Design a protein with these regions (language model features):
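Beta-lactam-recognizing serine transpeptidase/beta-lactamase-like catalytic domain environment
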Residues: 1-65, 70-266
Length: 266
């Protein structure tokens, strides 16, 4: 039950306390040595701002293995990989002076692209990133919308994403970026990018308003889909759909993305 899981995940409250400081920035303490909290009874405005902060567009995070879907799309669209392209994972992989591992230092062996995504194999995607090269990788990264705001019709969307530019993508930076560990972006950016990977290749501006009406209910403006650009081909997008369906399975497999399987949904 996705609604139940969401309710449980979001049930944890966040509590903030503001403490007094002196002119030098030192905390004021009582006779027991405890910090003295502010006594102004009206912090409702501050708490309200925190409560209504939309973290999906105002805060950054490192997407990690979720980004492997995007690297897979880059590989398929560029012709550097297909569903069946095999690469070997020995559990450790050296790039310059860095050594990368998969989770638990597990060696996945020879696997194709779909199997690598199911196994969340870091080493496979590092090698795929190397096949792409810094220039091609960055061009796709930019095309998927990670260097700009999504344009969603909500206030305060941040534009302060963190990532390596094309000239900064050296061997190590490219390797770390290929499995989502070297960029900080918003959750909504990731959502729109993955949508583009599976919807036929189109990067679409997300929106929450369907239409605007006047006081009499007359439609003043219809808010239609705004396709910003086509990032990958329809055929590449179809391959990514097939791979992601393989990850989820039919509800009988274990591991991979099996927990995301929902009967009746493709």
């Amino acid at each position: 039950n996705l609604a139940y899981v969401n309710e449980q995940v979001n049930a944890e409250p966040e509590i903030y306390t503001i403490y007094k400081k002196d002119a030098n920035g030192n905390y004021l303490r009582d006779e027991q040595g405890k910090k003295i909290p502010e006594e102004d009874p009206d912090y409702t405005g501050t708490y309200r701002d925190i409560q209504w902060k939309n973290k999906t567009i105002t805060e950054l995070y490192y997407p990690g293995s979720v980004f492997k879907v995007i690297t897979a799309a880059m590989g398929v669209d560029s012709g550097k990989a297909t569903y069946y392209t095999t690469l070997n994972c020995s559990g450790a992989y050296g790039v310059a002076k860095e050594t990368y591992h998969c989770a638990g230092k597990k060696a996945h062996g020879v696997q194709n692209l779909a199997e690598a995504l199911r196994n969340s194999c870091n080493i496979y995607f590092i090698q795929l990133g190397q096949r792409l090269g810094s220039s091609v990788f960055y061009d796709y990264f930019d095309a998927f919308g990670f260097t700009e705001r999504t344009g969603v019709d909500l206030p305060n969307e941040t534009g302060m994403m963190k990532y390596y530019t094309k000239s900064q993508l050296g061997e190590v930076e490219l390797s770390s970026s290929s499995f989502g560990q070297a960029m900080a972006v918003t959750p909504l950016q990731v959502c729109t990018a993955i949508s583009a990977a599976v919807n036929g290749g189109y990067l679409v501006t997300p929106h929450v308003v369907d239409k605007i009406t006047d006081q009499n209910g007359n439609v003043v403006e219809e808010i239609g889909a705004n396709v910003r650009r086509q990032v990958i081909s329809k055929s590449a997008s179809e391959t990514i759909r097939q791979i992601m369906e393989y990850e989820v399975g039919d509800g009988t497999i274990t591991g991979g993305g099996s927990n995301a399987y929902v009967a009746g949904y493709r």
